[in-house]
Amino acid sequence: MDPYMIQMSSKGNLPSILDVHVNVGGRSSVPGKMKGRKARWSVRPSDMAKKTFNPIRAIVDNMKVKPNPNKTMISLSIGDPTVFGNLPTDPEVTQAMKDALDSGKYNGYAPSIGFLSSREEIASYYHCPEAPLEAKDVILTSGCSQAIDLCLAVLANPGQNILVPRPGFSLYKTLAESMGIEVKLYNLLPEKSWEIDLKQLEYLIDEKTACLIVNNPSNPCGSVFSKRHLQKILAVAARQCVPILADEIYGDMVFSDCKYEPLATLSTDVPILSCGGLAKRWLVPGWRLGWILIHDRRDIFGNEIRDGLVKLSQRILGPCTIVQGALKSILCRTPGEFYHNTLSFLKSNADLCYGALAAIPGLRPVRPSGAMYLMVGIEMEHFPEFENDVEFTERLVAEQSVHCLPATCFEYPNFIRVVITVPEVMMLEACSRIQEFCEQHYHCAEGSQEECDK
């Protein structure tokens, strides 16, 4: 029997609950007025709501610039592969959903951590000798975002801190700060294909550090860490006894010239909570099915972390049951050709975009190795009329109707993030417009006229 299934009966021992609505001798004991409460309206948002802040929304929503009405808008800012319709999921995936819906078996509640059969499928799919998994090691969630939310909630208390990459996915900070958790930013190095500055990372760790977040492959960088670099990260975590939250939502989405290494396959010493989901690899972000894989071969987490994840998952009573019902077919029947074609398209677009932008004076793109993005440095000294990356992107929208995300959204100013999921024709047009924009606004830095005359 699934150890997480709780059987309730009328003879169960439930905690007593004080009910103030009782009658004694036919008279109500409910007081006419509660002491200490002033009878006037005073409804205010909670501290958690007030501390919740999404940098992307704050920056993008405050951009007042309208696109050029003479040019069709091209958005290179949204990390949703379904937006343009050129990257549909595989027919086997949609058929699996139809079959699950038509069966009528998945219209009710499931255990809050997911059906046992669905967790068994995930465990089987990701199991390997270097990182064995069973159903008890899997928590199903409402998307990878909720998986990250649960991991932070189970590992860190208010007043503790977590280590987050810079540049990095803004949701880490949004979730952590809403819980009263301090965020410490460790640097990724563009000159080293966005590897972690390991010395700075280790320097940030203190007695209040609750976990280290490692995002590989990376959003927003499109980088993929080598096996050797991952081993160095694990060595830091092992030395400092810091557990890892591995955001691996883009796992296996790497280009043909490199290899993806799941972090848990490289260590038996460091406890790891790996977060993933259907959203990106299967191109269905709206279906909201994610998971946490608990890797803890030395039993450092013990029962408390596992039980904590179960309790936290009960706050929303689990992810969509219909998607859970389709999960076996999605995992088993999606053809390898689907994954190959998706990655071939992304690599082709990445090469196209990188080549075009690298030829533009004043821009310094960093070649990606996976995921759906690349980062582009702006040599701001050559664009003196713009104060920062936010102004650069605002004017790019106003003049060329091309929208990229300023990397200030990812705590990394004077870069922009480009999404590479758009159709090829659109990518070519966007790069052409970016070139035109840069040529119009580029200025030689003082003392470098010779370079400009080339």
From Swiss-Prot:
Pathway(s) the chain acts in: Amino-acid degradation; L-phenylalanine degradation; acetoacetate and fumarate from L-phenylalanine: step 2/6
Entry-annotated residues carrying N6-(pyridoxal phosphate)lysine: 280
The family this protein is said to belong to: Belongs to the class-I pyridoxal-phosphate-dependent aminotransferase family.
Pfam families the record matches: Aminotran_1_2, TAT_ubiq
Quaternary organization: Homodimer.
Positions where N-acetylmethionine occurs in the chain: 1
Record-linked NCBIfam families: tyr_amTase_E, tyr_nico_aTase
GO cellular component: cytosol
Any GO MF annotation of the entry: identical protein binding
Name by which UniProt lists this protein: Tyrosine aminotransferase
Key words of the record: Acetylation, Aminotransferase, Disease variant, Intellectual disability, Palmoplantar keratoderma, Phenylalanine catabolism, Phosphoprotein, Pyridoxal phosphate, Transferase, Tyrosine catabolism
Keyword Transferase: yes
Keyword Mitochondrion: no
Gene (name only): TAT
Residues bearing the modification Phosphoserine: 448
Role description: Transaminase involved in tyrosine breakdown. Converts tyrosine to p-hydroxyphenylpyruvate. Can catalyze the reverse reaction, using glutamic acid, with 2-oxoglutarate as cosubstrate (in vitro). Has much lower affinity and transaminase activity towards phenylalanine.
InterPro entries: Aminotransferase_I/II_large, NHTrfase_class1_PyrdxlP-BS, PyrdxlP-dep_Trfase, PyrdxlP-dep_Trfase_major, PyrdxlP-dep_Trfase_small, Tyr_aminoTrfase_ubiquitination, TyrNic_aminoTrfase, Tyrosine_aminoTrfase
Coiled-coil positions: none
Cofactor: pyridoxal 5'-phosphate
GO annotation, biological process: 2-oxoglutarate metabolic process; biosynthetic process; glutamate metabolic process; L-phenylalanine catabolic process; response to dexamethasone; response to mercury ion; response to oxidative stress; tyrosine catabolic process
The reaction(s) this protein catalyses: L-tyrosine + 2-oxoglutarate = 3-(4-hydroxyphenyl)pyruvate + L-glutamate
Disease linked to the protein: Tyrosinemia 2: An inborn error of metabolism characterized by elevations of tyrosine in the blood and urine, and oculocutaneous manifestations. Typical features include palmoplantar keratosis, painful corneal ulcers, and intellectual disability.
EC class (word): transferase
Entry's EC annotation: 2.6.1.5
